[in-house]
Amino acid sequence: MEIHELQQLLSEMSLQEKIGQMVQLTGVYFDKEAVLTGVVGEQLPPEWIIQYAGSVLGVIGKDKIYDIQSRYMEQHPHHIPLLFMADVIHGCRTIYPIPLGQACSFHPELVSEAASIAASEASSEGLRATFSPMIDVSRDPRWGRVMESFGEDPYVNGIMGKAMVDGYQQKADTGIAACLKHFAGYGAVNAGREYNDVEISQRTFLEQYVKPFRMALKAKPAMVMTAFN
């Protein structure tokens, strides 16, 4: 769409539609046969959030995605399609070593090629974005997400992260949007506890934890995810 067309569309959208575009839901809310129980069933979002949601996480399979997208487009007042996203971390249908293992290869070209193949497979399923690569400098083995990272070295994280972004996004017809995460310092969570706080000096933060992002951003990833600390 041209800019003036987007501006016109935005001016016609209701406040609820605009808010909905910033919301991501899991596929369970669009599953006709799903039975929501427990905390999920008790804390259902308002119906208009489901009606106007902007993206869906974790739905795999082109038939499922087509069904959800068709039903959603039919009822949406402006027929804005859902954006389907998933954690394509180290492969989609074809599985490769975890990022920590890929880092041991010291071969960014292979890492980029693996990401390109994963993007092609994901794109064929209807996915348009992945929450990868994770380039948090990881030095505490107690942290449960160490395997998603490229390890303890800022330079290796930066080089491999850039290579992976290039692989995901290099082909216009089969590529998917990459997302650098988590900006920044998330790998230094206290006691290795997920979602915990971080206590590091400004110098350490800038020289070690921000460095991979400075390097990988040169590949122009479509997205950057903030840290949870």
Per-segment meaning from a language model:
Residues 1-229:
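Glycoside hydrolase catalytic-domain context in secreted enzymes
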